[in-house]
Amino acid sequence: MKGSAMSQQKEEFVLNVAACDACGETPRKYFVHSVKAVPDWNTIPVAPLDCCAWGGSYRVYGQAQLVLLRDVGFMCRLQCEEQAPVARYQTYFSPVYQDSCMEFFCAFDQNSEKYLNVEMNAKGTCLCEIGTNRHDRVDASENGTVPPVKVEPFAQRTSWSLLLTIPFVTLTRLFGVTQETFVPGYQFRGNFYKCGDASTATHYTMWNPVRTPTPDFHQPSFFGTFVMQ
């Protein structure tokens, strides 16, 4: 996280949050690479979480990366720099969004309104749901089995990251899609978020801006676009 690319992204982030409108109105696109093995993440495009909303002066730099790992599923890497991240919850389906939390929302089937939300704190504690809107959500786990989350320990409590794997078998169960669905040019939608509803400093940042008057990440109309390469 401390490389020159991270520093450059962080400088751009400071400029963007100063105005908050720098993200623009057009949904952003992220081009998803298909790889044979766990990649060198320095070679994978970064989605900066540089749009902020709903007030407050505290800002956290975050970024996300997404790849299709052949014969396995999708891997999502989430990183942030944050002073003293809060991680109180330790059991599945706890309200981890109240901790220092990073989130991945995604509608993998371009022909369905259903989307998956995976929310994780700095300990890797996970909340995973599926549905068509905020009020239509059900537990997305299978008998308590959730997508594996690897926590990359934060150094001196100033940065932390997560590596989430969503297997194809899970996507087939939830969306009816398979590995063969994700051919080059296939498009689907989603967003990346960083929040801390009840942390020491409440904050909300995201990849694609959510333009609602009050905090609400369950807004698929504001999702960005993922394009398979």
Give the ranges of each region predicted by the language model.
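Structural preference for beta-rich elements and adjacent junctions enriched in aromatics
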Residues: K2-Q229
